[in-house]
Amino acid sequence: MNSWWGRLMMKRLCRLVWLLPLTAVLLFTLVSLAPIDPVQAYVGARMSMIGPEQQAAIEAAWGLDQPGWIRFFHWLAHLVQGDLGDSISYNAPVLTVLVERFPASLALMGCSFLAAFVVGSGLGVLAAACQGRWPDRLIRGWAMVISVSPGFWIALLFISIFAVQLAWLPSCCALPPGVTQDEAHWWQYGRHLVLPVLTLSIYGTGPLILHVRQRLIGFLDGPSARHLRLHGMSSTRLALGPGSRHALGSAVTVHLASIGELFGGSVLAETIFAWPGLGQATVKAATGADAPLLLGIALVTVVVVLLGNLLADILAAWVDPRLRIMPQEETLPRLKRLPWLKASARLKTASRLKVEPKS
């Protein structure tokens, strides 16, 4: 047990060690090669009012007059000291921008993640329990349509229905106009959060529905389900009880592993609904060639995705304890294939791994 957790943590830590520098190098290279002038993107229409001397002074203040590789190593040296640099787009430290905008993105992605899991897994279980009947066909058709539908089309459809025609929900920002964060109530945040969460969660339910349905049908057609039916358990109770536990174990892993896609979808949702999170900051930094802010957001994204994968492995092993034993069982056959290993050594290895050796 302890060795399994140790191997898992070491594997994720090693992946983080090489993935963070690689992400930083690739992203900094792409930003440096982008045909965007950061000074012009920052000044905008007033660029004609700035002379060459002023433009050179701004570039020198931002360090843009130096080669890209020198700027990268300067950024890396400051990163080791805990300084992510200054954002060109917001004229503020990158760490300040991340701290101010990360809670809004976390609320959006967290609510969307939970809503997508509850709705997707519930509909997947219902489709498997009604296999071959009209609820199954209806849910499968809806999941396939949602899976291939563009996210921006879903967002615009919800805005047209709930914000324009019915006027039930707001379609912009996190608060009503003229209301500050100190004056706002929780229900005002909630009303502005409904449409972005609805868009982001529905977009992620399609693959989850199909996955849960397939896993549950495989369990219901297996020997364990036939054994339970012989003991008098009905198909509905079987699907909602042990079958759903079997399917939801892998569904948690699949859903947590899609956190990277969830962040990518949040960029689109925050842009369409003007939600003040990291997604909106990503678009502004990309269009303004704001390399320090893009690098800061990329590092946060990589850490969040790796933590999601780690949590997926932990929850999957907690739901299915066989996953904690499998890595040990896979080592024994490799030892048996070594001809120079003595039989006594193989027996000791099998005893230590608590696996019964074959005669």
In which residue ranges do the predicted regions lie?
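Alpha-helical transmembrane segments of integral membrane proteins
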Residues: 2-7, 20, 98-135, 151, ...
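N-terminal signal-anchor/signal peptide hydrophobic helix marking the start
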Residues: 10-16
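Short hydrophobic, aromatic-rich alpha-helical segments embedded in or entering the lipid bilayer
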Residues: 49-81, 273-285
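Individual transmembrane alpha-helix segments
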Residues: 67-111
